[in-house]
UniProtKB/Swiss-Prot annotation:
SUPFAM superfamilies: Pentein. Belongs to the eIF-6 family. SMART domains: eIF6. InterPro entries: eIF6 (IPR002769). Keywords: Initiation factor, Protein biosynthesis. The keyword Transcription regulation does not apply. This is Translation initiation factor 6. Gene3D superfamilies: L-arginine/glycine Amidinotransferase, Chain A (3.75.10.10).
Length: 220
């Protein structure tokens, strides 16, 4: 099975889609090749919509098997598509690009260090997870500096031992460093993964793919 793809030639596939368990949210302009790759690689149902009229779904949506946290600027029509499959929480802060500022699985969420504590608590209660404020190697947009499933977490290669230890404590699963698309530490921009499988941007090297497989347990 092919493990790399593009979004209309762009290897930053994580910017244009959000995978949450058995669903993937993608924009209407997603090419058929991209749709097929996600279906086959991740075994997900596709929810097709823009968010606040934009195709950058990965930056504007975060979530897990219980719910989706979405930019507060999403329209009622867009939210209706999501609500058929998940409960939805609107992030109405200045920092409303949910996919950029939240990394989550079914156990934990790591959020931007400047996200207000009360909002972080609300996200935790909504997703049913423990929440920590975190940077990863100096990067504050945790949703792009890391990717989590229920089996593993991959983070920016500059993440410190202390940051990794905090993630291991809150998640209880393996945490490893890696890159995507020939050296990008912003792994969330080029990686879509769930407990079933993964897809990476087509600029990703064989070594980088091997690291993804190792961290998420696909080599077992």
């Amino acid at each position: 099975m092919e493990r790399t793809t593009t979004f209309a030639g762009d290897p930053n596939i994580g910017v244009f889609a959000r995978v949450a368990g058995n669903i993937a949210v993608i924009p209407p302009e997603a090419p058929e090749e991209f749709r097929n790759a996600i279906r086959e690689g991740l075994g997900v149902e596709l929810l097709v919509t823009t968010i606040q009229g934009s195709a950058i779904i990965g930056s504007l949506v975060a979530g897990n098997s219980r719910g989706l946290v979405v930019s507060g600027l999403a329209t009622d029509e867009e939210l209706a598509v999501l609500k058929k499959h998940r409960k939805v929480m609107l992030l109405c802060e200045t920092m409303n690009a949910a996919g950029n500022v939240i990394m989550a699985n079914d156990t934990f969420a790591a959020v931007h260090p400047d996200l207000p504590a009360e909002v972080a608590e609300e996200i935790g209660a909504f997703l049913g997870v423990e929440v920590i404020h975190l940077t990863l190697g100096g990067v504050r947009t945790t949703g792009m500096a890391g990717v989590a499933t229920n089996k593993g977490v991959i983070v920016h290669p500059r993440a410190t031992a202390q940051e990794i230890a905090r993630l291991e404590t809150v998640s209880g699963i393996p945490v490893g460093t890696g890159t995507i698309n020939m050296g990008s530490g912003l792994v969330g921009t080029g990686l879509l993964v769930n407990d079933t499988g993964y897809l990476a941007g087509n600029a990703t090297s064989g070594f980088e793919l091997g690291r993804v497989e190792d961290v998420f347990g696909f080599l077992e």
